Curated annotation (Swiss-Prot):
Top-level taxon of origin: Eukaryota
Gene this protein is translated from: TRPV1
PANTHER family recorded: TRANSIENT RECEPTOR POTENTIAL CATION CHANNEL SUBFAMILY V MEMBER 1 (PTHR10582:SF17), TRANSIENT RECEPTOR POTENTIAL ION CHANNEL PROTEIN (PTHR10582)
Post-translational modification, as annotated: Phosphorylation by PKA reverses capsaicin-induced dephosphorylation at multiple sites. Phosphorylation by CAMKII seems to regulate binding to vanilloids. Phosphorylated and modulated by PRKCE, PRKCM and probably PRKCZ. Dephosphorylation by calcineurin seems to lead to receptor desensitization and phosphorylation by CAMKII recovers activity.
Family named by the database record: Belongs to the transient receptor (TC 1.A.4) family. TrpV subfamily. TRPV1 sub-subfamily.
Extent of the ANK repeats: 111-139, 154-186, 204-229, 250-277, 286-322, 336-359, 394-416
Protein name (database record): Transient receptor potential cation channel subfamily V member 1
Disulfide bridge positions per record: none
InterPro entries: Ankyrin_rpt, Ankyrin_rpt-contain_sf, Ion_trans_dom, TRPV, TrpV1-4
Positions of the UniProt region annotated as Interaction with calmodulin: 769-803
Amino acid sequence: MKNWGSSDSGGSEDPPQEDSCLDPLDGDPNSRPVPAKPHIFPTAKSRSRLFGKCDSEEASMDCSYEEGQLASCPAITVSPVVMIPKHEDGPTCARQPSQDSVTAGSEKSLKLYDRRKIFEAVAQNNCEELQSLLLFLQKSKKHLMDSEFKDPETGKTCLLKAMLNLHDGQNDTIPLLLEIARQTDSLKELVNASYTDSYYKGQTALHIAIERRNMALVTLLVENGADVQAAANGDFFKKTKGRPGFYFGELPLSLAACTNQLGIVKFLLQNSWQPADISARDSVGNTVLHALVEVADNTADNTKFVTSMYNEILILGAKLHPTLKLEGLTNKKGLTPLALAARSGKIGVLAYILQREIQEPECRHLSRKFTEWAYGPVHSSLYDLSCIDTCEKNSVLEVIAYSSSETPNRHDMLLVEPLNRLLQDKWDRFVKRIFYFNFFIYCLYMIIFTTAAYYRPVDGLPPYKLKHTVGDYFRVTGEILSVLGGVYFFFRGIQYFLQRRPSLKTLFVDSYSEMLFFVQSLFMLGTVVLYFCHHKEYVASMVFSLAMGWTNMLYYTRGFQQMGIYAVMIEKMILRDLCRFMFVYLVFLFGFSTAVVTLIEDGKNNSVPTESTLHRWRGPGCRPPDSSYNSLYSTCLELFKFTIGMGDLEFTENYDFKAVFIILLLAYVILTYILLLNMLIALMGETVNKIAQESKNIWKLQRAITILDTEKSFLKCMRKAFRSGKLLQVGYTPDGKDDYRWCFRVDEVNWTTWNTNVGIINEDPGNCEGIKRTLSFSLRSGRVSGRNWKNFSLVPLLRDASTRERHPAQPEEVHLRHFAGSLKPEDAEIFKDPVGLGEK
C-alpha cells in the first residue's frame, strides 16, 4: 500500500477503490512514470494530527493502487500522475494530458473554472467540485494566485476563503488547494497571500487559523511555508477610537497571545520549520508584551489571562534567549511594557509587573520583587526600581503623574507598592522641607505685594516720582519685588505649558493651580504696562492680581493632608456643582431681566416716588438714585438682590401691568432663591460624601506631582545624592554574573499569606546589613510600622548624603538563599521545638 503523503513505497494488499482507477497507459505498464508524491504531510505525526489516521491504518484521504492492475486499462500517453484527494472515498488520480495526446484530450470536454465557482466550492467544503482544477490550471497554464482567481476589491484568495469557511473546525479543500499550489509552483505565494484592501490589509491564512483557534491548520500552514512574521496592519487591526476593530500587535505570535492560546504561542516559538521572533515589533514598535498590555481592560477575567500569558511568554523567552531583555524593549514612543501599562491605566497589569516574583531558579532574574526575609506574617521585600524612579527616562512615576486626566485609574495606580512607599520616602527625606520653605517665601512675597499695593500713591498720574524718603524706598522696593515675582510665575507657566501641553480638560482638572498662577502673572504684567502708559486703570489690574495671589495660597495646602483634601473638595464643587448652577442661574437671570426691562417705561411716575422707595435713602448725605431702570444692567443688579434675599418688590414704579410685573418677580424668586440655591446646597453635600475617598487620592496625586517637580529642579548630581533605595545583589544573571539591582525595601504584614512559598529568605529576619540605612515605613493598612518593630529604624537618607560624598558607594551584597520545599499543615508540629525555627 502507498499512503498518500507517506515517504514509504510499500505495496498494498487491499484492492483498489473504484473511483481511484488510473487512466490507461500506452506501451508497457511497467515502464510508466512513477506517480509524484505530494508533500503536504511530510510526517506521520502531522498527517494523523489533521485526519486522525496513521500508517498502520489507511486514512480517509489515502490512495491505494497496485501496479499490476494497470495493464487491464486502455493505454494512452499522459503526464505524471497527480493525486487529488476526495473527502469521502479517498483520492482520485487525475492526469494532465501531454502535448502528444491533444487529439485524445479533445474528445473529452475540459471543465472550466472561474473565481466564483472555486469560491463556492471551498465555501461548501466540496472537494469533488475541484477534482479537475489542477488539470484546468495546467492546461491553461494558470495559477491560483492569478488576479482572475482573487477578489478584485479585497485580494481574497481561495485559500483565505476556505479558511473563513470551516466546518467543525476543518475544511477538506484546504490541503487540496495547497497540493494544487505545490504542483503549479505557487505554494509559497498562496500560503502567504494576504488581503490588499485598506481595512484587512496584511491578514494571511495564518492569522485566520490562529483567530479560529485551530492548531491543526496552524501547523499545516507553518509546515508549508507560512510566514510567521506577516503583519496584519489594516485599519481593522489598528487601535483607533470610535472605529470597530481589534488591535493585537499585527503579528501571528501577538495574535495568539492576545487571544489566550498558549499552545499556539509555544508552537510558533519552538517549531522546527520557522520559529517566530519573540522580540519582533509591529508598525508602532510594540512587541508581544506591549500587545498584551494593550488588550488588557482591567476586568478580573481579562487581567487574569493577560498576566498569566505575560508571565509564560517572559519565562519562555528567557529559556529560548537567556541574554535577551524582552521586558526592556521599547516601542516608538520610548515606552516599555511597564511604562505602557502606567500610561494606559492598566492597573492590574501594572501591579503584576511591579510585584512579580518568580521562584524558578533559572528564571529568577526576571523577578522585580525579592522577598529578603519573612517571619510569620511579616515580610521584607526588595523592589527593583529600574524603570520606576525618576532617574530614568519615561519612568513609571513620571508617566502616571504627568499623564492625561483621562487616563483611567490614574489616582489608584500611585497606591500600588512600591510607588506609594517610594513617594512617601521622597517626601519625608527632603521634599517636604523644600516645600515648606517655598511656602514661607510665597507668604513673604504676598505680604510685600499687599503692602506695596496698599501704600500706592493716589495723587496724579503714573509713573510717580520717587520721593527720597525711607517709606518711598521701601514702597519702590516692594513694587520691584512684586513685579519680579510676577515675571517668575509667568515664565514658570510658559515652561509648564510647553512641557506638558495640557488639553483643555486637563487644564481645568489637573492644572488649575498652574493656570491661576499664570493668570496672576498676566495681571501683574498688565499692571506694569498700564502704569508706564500713564493709565490709572493699572490699579484695577493690580487688585485682580492681588486677589488671585491670595487665592493661590490654596496651592500650598497640598503639603498638609487634611487641608489638601479640603482644597480638592472645593475645587471639585466649583468645577462640578457650581458651574452647573451658574449656567442655569444665568439663564434665569437674563430671561427674567429682559422680561422685566420690557415692562419698565422711562419717564412714567418719575415725579411721584413711593414711600417704600424713599425710606431707603433717608439719612445724612443720602439721596435717591436715578429711578430709571430701563436698562438691562440695572435690572440684572436688582434681580440679583432677590437671589441673595435683599430684593424689593417695589424697587420701581415705572411699569405697566403691575400684576404681570409682580408675577414675574415672584416666579424669579421661587426659581432662584428657593429652588436653585437649595439644590446647590444639596448637591454640594452629596458631592462631599461621594468624593471623600476620591479627594484623598487626588490629593496624593497632587503631592506626587509636587515631589517630582521638586526633584526635577535639582541638578543631576543632587538627584543621585537624594536617590531612594540601595544597590544590592539579588542573585545571578543567566551568564553567571552577579545581578545587582537598585532596590527599595518595603516591610509588609499579610495575615492571609504566610511564608510557606517564599522563594528567597534571609536566615536572620530584620538583622540585615543596610537596613539601618534604608527606610522602613509605617504602613497604616497591612504594613509594618518602623516604630512598632524592634529591629526597624527610621533614619533619613539625607544623613547619608554626606557619607556618600566621603565614601564612594559600593554595591551592597545581600545574601539571599532559596527556601527549598514548602511547609504543609502537618509539618507545623516541628515548630513547637525552638530549634525548628532555623539556624541563628
